[in-house]
Amino acid sequence: MSSHPPAPRKHVTIHELRRMKESGERIAMVTAYDATAARLVAVAGVDAVLVGDSLGMAVQGHESTLPVTLDQMVYHSAMVRRGLARGDGRAHLVTDMSFGSYQASADEAVKAAMRLVAEGGAEAVKLEGGAEFGEVIRRIVRAGVPVMGHIGLTPQSVHKMGGYVVQGKDSEKAQQILRDARALEAAGCYALVLECIPSELARIVTSQLRVPTIGIGAGPHCDGQVLVLNDLLGLDASFTPRFVKRFGEVGAAVQDAVGAYVGEVKARAFPDDAHSFHSSSVRLVPVERHAEAAEEEPPDAIGAPI
């Protein structure tokens, strides 16, 4: 038996993702919004991490992704980058471009993408939309920033789409999604997210593209899958879309743990001796002196209150 430790896993690049598609190896991607989550998912072995604008709903409590700002995406992306570095450093990091950061002009889009890379530590950016964003994608790619596309259900267009509904169910809309997929590949996207489209359509799109497809609510035929971390952990028992499989019941575990903590505090069972500090050299102020000091004028406060 060899005594040599196993070789460290290679960092996943855009080229490695293409190789995975070509070899038939499935790509596992999840979202993360902070350093702790990023470290945990990295150690768990994910291939890619998405700092999604879904943080607007999963973290900030909004009803949609629309209120999320570019500054917030930069902030969360930088946190995730630090967390991945504390994991195994292997996962590929993609960050969403927020609503309004790329729709107005290609110039603004390039500047926003460069911020996400330079300040947020992203290796690539993801933007939503079809062929109409082809020139924006070309400009960003020419600036040196890889772009992941996103078609099908695009949450930033929720009002235009009339809600969070499956896309491409009829022949005409399915053909448009296929045309958009080809156009985004031609514009320079290195991968595409396919969200909430029929499994049959996702299979056709995947088979006709050279770049990897990452599905969410798009069936088993994509080259990879992505889920929102909060959803797969079961943090919100009230949110159960059909395409989400809950791989844990972390929400219930959190409630149980915090409930146990509250109970022990109320019962004066925590902290106990094992969770307290001790010293044999502490000098106590006599009770009488302490009482006299209480009657004296209190000194000026030093430092900030807590």
Curated annotation (Swiss-Prot):
3-methyl-2-oxobutanoate binds at D53, S54, D96, K126. Its cofactor is Mg(2+). It comes from the Bacteria. SUPFAM superfamilies: Phosphoenolpyruvate/pyruvate domain. The keyword Metal-binding applies. Its EC number is 2.1.2.11. It is an enzyme of class 2 (transferase). The active site is at E195. One of its GO terms (molecular function) is magnesium ion binding. Its main location: cytoplasm. One of its GO terms (biological process) is pantothenate biosynthetic process. Keywords: Cytoplasm, Magnesium, Metal-binding, Pantothenate biosynthesis, Transferase. It catalyses: 3-methyl-2-oxobutanoate + (6R)-5,10-methylene-5,6,7,8-tetrahydrofolate + H2O = 2-dehydropantoate + (6S)-5,6,7,8-tetrahydrofolate. Mg(2+) binds at D53, D96, E128. Pathway: Cofactor biosynthesis; (R)-pantothenate biosynthesis; (R)-pantoate from 3-methyl-2-oxobutanoate: step 1/2. Gene3D superfamilies: Phosphoenolpyruvate-binding domains. It is found in: Cytoplasm. Binds 1 Mg(2+) ion per subunit. One of its GO terms (cellular component) is cytoplasm. Homodecamer; pentamer of dimers. Catalyzes the reversible reaction in which hydroxymethyl group from 5,10-methylenetetrahydrofolate is transferred onto alpha-ketoisovalerate to form ketopantoate. Belongs to the PanB family. PANTHER family: 3-METHYL-2-OXOBUTANOATE HYDROXYMETHYLTRANSFERASE. This is 3-methyl-2-oxobutanoate hydroxymethyltransferase. It comes from Anaeromyxobacter sp. (strain K).
